Amino acid sequence: MLDFACMAKIDSLSVFLPAFNEEKDIGRTVSQVRDTLIKTADNWELMVINDGSKDNTRKIVEDLINKDLHIKIINHDINRGYGASLKSGFYSAKYPWIAFIDSDGQFDFSEIGKFIEKQKETNADLVVGYYIKRKVSYLKIITSKVWELLVFILFGLKVRDIDCGFKLISKKVIEKIPKLESERGAFISSEFLIKAKKTGFKIVEIPVTHFPARRVGTGRKLNVIIQSFVDLLKLWRRL
């Protein structure tokens, strides 16, 4: 955990957490993010994007809202996918800067201070995390690197970890890039960064600590992976 006294500050920040059946982690994650935001931002909001959870995720968040109105929930009636959750967060954020992290404990949100400091040093529009040491299987690492190589070949986008679920983004990026289309799987991350680069926004990277995910998301299912490759080629033809 970082020293809050030395942490970089920001005037206003919208943060959102995509969540699907996260009853085991969501309460702790929301509390940790809230504690950091109190010390980091003068004005802030914390949104949980509840993607059709069938467990107690919604109830846990609503109980937290009763204690702090900075916390909000956006409910999807059905499970629409990771891409849909990110879009709900992006397009609902009200402050000039937006951050998001996965809600299953993979990241330490107190590292947001490093993102803010990096943005101020570089005047970047997007600060993208990359894993210091990723706590996943070698197969996942290899497939991710193959994907990143393909994205670089097709679009010239070179980042260490396209799918890293910890980013700081200027709201003007969301307002100016072509509307995001992806719904399921992790293709949304590639689509977003490709469109941001194509529009001329500055992207910088910063290392983040990674902790093992509690469960496997839909982004790793074979049909979703295949569809992601199809979507990538479609995007290449359009751009």
What is each residue range found by the language model?
Residues 44, 58-92:
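Conserved donor nucleotide-binding strand/loop of the catalytic core
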Residues 184, 193-210:
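Catalytic donor-sugar/metal-binding loop of nucleotide-sugar-dependent glycosyltransferases
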Residues 12-14, 45, 191:
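Cell-envelope/extracellular polymer assembly enzymes that use nucleotide-activated donors
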Residues 22-37:
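Short, well-formed alpha-helical segments that are part of the catalytic scaffolds
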Residues 50-59, 105:
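A conserved acidic beta->alpha catalytic loop
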Residues 76-92, 97, 109-186, 211-230, ...:
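Acceptor/aglycone-binding surface of glycosyltransferases and processive sugar-polymer synthases
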Residues 24-28, 55-64:
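Acidic helix N-cap motif at the loop->helix transition within catalytic regions
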